């Protein structure tokens, strides 16, 4: 079970975007995520007449390693760690480590 999922609000812990918050848009692979408005770079794109695209400079969101983000706890207003709790019926749920409160998906 992944501890950080698509749609979670996260805080960036390291890098030039440290402290920024955003929602996870996509899990690129097992270790990388795309966070809305974070790690945006300028990409130079060549024109392609076959596809009908014009060239120029485009803002593009790049992946960030999931170890560099932490889930945002709205109760405390800070970054928090995620734990897995086993319920009585055998279901696994994600909880905030600091409060033990269940994370709403």
Curated annotation (Swiss-Prot):
Record Pfam families: ribosomal_L24 (PF17136)
Keyword annotations: Ribonucleoprotein, Ribosomal protein, RNA-binding, rRNA-binding
Top-rank lineage group of the source organism: Bacteria
Any single Gene Ontology cellular-component annotation: ribosome
InterPro entries: Rib_uL2_dom2, Ribosomal_uL24, Ribosomal_uL24_CS, Ribosomal_uL24_KOW, Translation_prot_SH3-like_sf
Gene Ontology biological-process annotations: translation
GO MF terms, alphabetically ordered: rRNA binding; structural constituent of ribosome
Function: One of two assembly initiator proteins, it binds directly to the 5'-end of the 23S rRNA, where it nucleates assembly of the 50S subunit. One of the proteins that surrounds the polypeptide exit tunnel on the outside of the subunit.
Assembly: Part of the 50S ribosomal subunit.
Similarity section: Belongs to the universal ribosomal protein uL24 family.
Stated name of the protein: Large ribosomal subunit protein uL24
Organism, scientific name: Leptothrix cholodnii (strain ATCC 51168 / LMG 8142 / SP-6) (Leptothrix discophora (strain SP-6))
Taxonomic lineage from the root: Bacteria, Pseudomonadati, Pseudomonadota, Betaproteobacteria, Burkholderiales
Originating gene: rplX
